[in-house]
A protein has these predicted regions:
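Hydrophobic alpha-helical segments and their helix-loop junctions in multi-pass secondary transporters
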Residues: 23-32, 136, 140-144, 148-163, ...
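Membrane-interface "cap" regions at the ends of multi-pass membrane proteins
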Residues: 2-66, 176-179, 198, 533, ...
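Loop-to-helix junctions at membrane interfaces in multi-pass transport proteins
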Residues: 3-6, 43-46, 74, 78-82, ...
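Transmembrane helix-loop boundary segments of multi-pass membrane transporters
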Residues: 3-8, 69-82, 144-164, 182-192, ...
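Helix-loop-helix module between adjacent transmembrane segments
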Residues: 21, 80-177, 262-270, 279, ...
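Terminal cytosolic tails of multi-pass membrane transporters
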Residues: 31, 479-569, 588-634
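Loop-to-transmembrane helix boundary motifs in multi-pass membrane proteins
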Residues: 119-126, 136-137, 166, 380-423, ...
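Hydrophobic, small-residue-rich membrane helices and short re-entrant helix-turn-helix hairpins
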Residues: 108-117, 179-192, 273-307, 371-374, ...
């Protein structure tokens, strides 16, 4: 090992990591046994998900740990604004979840890919599935790279990056390939506990490394030396440092800054919906878990994500690019653009605090393992029609399991192969994947709400949308308004799908979609005394307003509402900048709104009578034999 010294805390981390791996293998074996007994199609373990929001919390913790600061390349509060997808995703999932769950039950679909195949045929299902599968390979490569960097840091270099990648890949194949979401369900409590402890530990240790809460807050005023300045056109004095405010205003041409962040949120939110939330929603057997996951994931998981992102994002500002620390942080050489910014602070923290490797390592490993399992489960669910075909019954169940195992293994192998590319190339592929994958949300929404959009229209629209999104990445066409390529792809898909559907207004599966939508309306038609009928439009309006002010152009109001950041810190209403207060208020109100949607409006609940109606639609009772006129009643 050369000059690397293996200390007690490194040994403890390696030992506990091995224990986590062994337990993961055990959970995977149990999941596979349950899979074979139930003849299901890789659904999550409901018993492991009851009332604790583990899948959502662990997934968001992984984003808060690494992916948001890394992908966005932002320090400070702009990164925390992106982190509010921890609220946006559960909010949208609450609106979509019940209808999507019921529609799949009405039509007998057990996965996202099967749902699209039933409604639009193999063409739409194949385009959407292959797009999501390719994106999953890229995202999983980033997760493996993050895991390798984490393990290398916490082991003080005792384990090389290549070895870490190999270990993580083998563990994913052994745990994720056999049972996917079901394994995630078995591990959800452990993932949640370890990820939460790791997140809290990171926050406390980084703050201590920066000199305590007072020094951290006081150091915000010195952040001007680290990031460039931008204008907000007069709000609170005009020019704010990007570390302390979100650029943009309501002035001509400047609202696009807010729309840029909003469109980035839309891209990430749609990707998480398609690859994590909707596949899990469709696969779960208990519809009530939609509300539980959304509420707990947004409240606790959202809090962790925003807090960790702010601390890590602000902490990286204390280390300038020359490696000279401008606050009480151990000077660390600046790394290449492809490295995780947070790794700078993590290295400093692990050198300074005993047992930091154990806390950070296990928390990060649990969070990354959770989201990797979710990516594998979502991708295989989208790809399943490619190998399932028209099979039914036990034969279909066996092929579904075998095909999912092969597909998951192929995705992991593909992700590892991408790591041999230059980091800049990998980051370009990530930008492309984040732009293309959201296009698949259009056929899902069309099947649930707009059944008149035809198969031909959606195929043409998706091809056009994927083309425009790709061109927007490499040859920007609308860079003047700075909208993310995913938004351009979604808009193109919708426009082309509508135009082609008008020209060819019918397809062979349209009757199936119209009947299912009519059945949903009949089953969930409000009663005469139902007072919630008028609340749904108001709830949608409130949700749109929340998105506008919390994530869209309206967020610039928070720059100076509680004290302009270019004023002395003593004149602030709180010890932290105004935009930070605004973001935590956005988190609190967003979590409360999700709770109201899920509980107050019952958007994630189904009565026994409604379940009976759903089952009756899917499996209609045989027609009663009529009694002939010549048959006696005696």
């Amino acid at each position: 090992l050369g000059e690397t010294a293996i200390t007690l805390d490194v040994v403890a981390f390696i030992t506990l990591a091995c224990a986590l791996a062994v337990y993961s293998l055990y959970a995977s074996a149990v999941s596979l046994r349950d899979e074979a007994a139930a003849h299901t199609t890789l659904g999550p373990s409901v018993s492991g998900l009851v009332a604790n929001g583990g899948l959502a919390t662990a997934s968001f913790a992984a984003l808060g740990f690494f992916l948001t600061p890394w992908l966005m390349r932002l320090g400070g509060y702009p990164a925390a604004t992106i982190a509010l997808i921890a609220i946006t995703v559960p909010m949208i999932a609450t609106f979509l979840g019940l209808r999507c769950w019921v529609m799949t039950r009405l039509q007998g679909a057990t996965g996202l890919g099967e749902f699209l195949a039933i409604n639009y045929g193999m063409g739409v299902a194949a385009v959407a599935g292959l797009t999501l599968g390719a994106a999953a390979i890229v995202f999983l490569a980033l997760v493996l790279l993050a895991a390798a960097s984490l393990m290398s840091i916490v082991s003080s270099g005792a384990i090389s990056n290549a070895t870490c990648i190999a270990i993580a890949a083998v563990l994913l194949v052994l745990t994720g390939a056999p049972a996917g979401f079901r394994t995630a369900g078995q591990l959800t409590r452990l993932h949640t506990l370890l990820a939460s402890i790791g997140a809290i530990g990171i926050v406390l240790m980084v703050v201590a490394q920066l000199g305590g809460w007072d020094e951290t807050a006081a150091g915000l005023t010195r952040a001007a030396r680290q990031l460039e300045w931008a204008t907000t056109s007069g709000r609170g004095g005009g020019d704010y440092n990007l570390a302390l405010a979100v650029a943009g205003s309501f002035g001509p041409g400047e609202t696009w800054n807010g729309l840029t962040i909003l469109s980035v949120q839309i891209a990430i939110a749609c990707t998480l919906l398609l690859m994590v939330w909707l596949p899990w929603t469709i696969a779960t057997t208990d519809v009530r878990q939609i509300g539980s996951q959304a509420t707990i994931g947004a409240s606790w998981g959202g809090f962790l994500m925003i807090a960790v992102t702010i601390i890590l994002g602000m902490g990286t500002l204390w280390i300038d690019r020359s490696g000279v620390a401008s606050a009480p942080v151990v000077p660390i050489p600046w790394r290449n653009i492809g490295d995780i910014d947070a790794a700078l602070l993590m290295t400093a923290v692990t050198r300074e605090y005993v047992w930091a490797e154990v806390v950070i390592g296990l928390g990060g490993a649990a969070a990354l393992h959770a989201i990797a399992l979710a990516l594998l489960g979502g991708a295989t669910a989208a790809l399943r029609p490619l190998w399932l075909g028209r099979l039914q019954g036990k034969q279909a169940a066996r092929r579904a399991v075998a095909g999912s195992q092969i597909a998951a293994s192929a995705i992991v192998i593909g992700a590892v192969s991408l790591l041999f590319m230059p980091v800049d190339t990998l980051m370009s592929l990530n930008a492309l994947a984040l732009s293309l994958s959201p296009v698949a949300i259009v056929p899902v929404a069309a099947a649930c709400w707009f059944p008149t959009l035809t198969r031909q229209g959606l195929i043409a629209g998706m091809i056009a949308g994927l083309t425009v999104a790709t061109l927007e990445i490499f040859l920007p066409l609308i860079s003047s308004i700075a909208v993310h390529a995913a938004a351009a792809g979604i808009a193109t898909t919708v426009i082309v799908a509508v135009l082609v559907s008008r020209g060819r207004p019918h397809d062979t599966r349209q009757v199936t979609r119209i009947k299912a939508n009519a059945a949903f309306r009949d089953i969930f038609a409000p009663g005469a005394n139902d007072q919630s009928q008028g609340r749904y439009p108001r709830a949608i309006l409130v949700a749109l307003m929340w998105i506008f002010f919390a994530s869209g152009p309206g967020m610039v109001i928070g720059n100076d509402l509680f004290g302009a950041p270019n004023l002395p810190r003593a004149q602030w209403d709180f010890p932290i900048p105004s935009i930070a207060v605004w973001q935590f208020l956005a988190w609190a109100t967003g979590a409360a709104l999700i709770w109201y949607l899920a509980r107050g409006l019952g958007m994630t609940s189904v009565t026994r009578a409604q379940l009976d109606q759903i089952n009756a639609y899917r499996n209609p009772p045989p027609a009663a034999r009529q009694t002939g006129p010549n048959i006696s009643d005696h």
